[in-house]
Amino acid sequence: MNNSDIDKSFYSVLEFVRIFRRRNKLQREISDNEKKIRDNQKRVLLLRNLIDYIKSENSIEGVQVIITNMCNDYEDRVDDYIIKNAELSKERRELSKKLKQFKQSDNN
């Protein structure tokens, strides 16, 4: 192998790494933007829900009760999602252990 082949190989590896990093950065940015879209869609839904519940005849106390109830509902949903994520994480760990055992049994 001569120096020009080594240089080409080296630059090919550098280009591969650059492209790989850029792709990963784009994936992170896309994921971040999707999260922002979801968050803003939720805010729009929340405001629409408020418009549906709040009427001109509501007192300030009535509006506060509506907002408190909606807040409690959303907090309950967050708790449910936290529990579901914990269950999914536990299942993922168990599957990872099983896959590791399969790999070890294949090597033996």
UniProtKB/Swiss-Prot annotation:
UniProt keyword annotations, A-Z: Coiled coil, Cytoplasm
Coiled-coil ranges from the UniProt annotation: 71-105
Annotated GO CC locations: cytosol
InterPro entries: DUF496 (IPR007458)
Family: Belongs to the pole-localizer TmaR family.
Protein name (Swiss-Prot/TrEMBL): Pole-localizer protein TmaR
Domain of life: Bacteria
The protein's role, per its UniProt record: Pole-localizer protein involved in the regulation of several cellular processes.
Keyword Cytoplasm annotated: yes
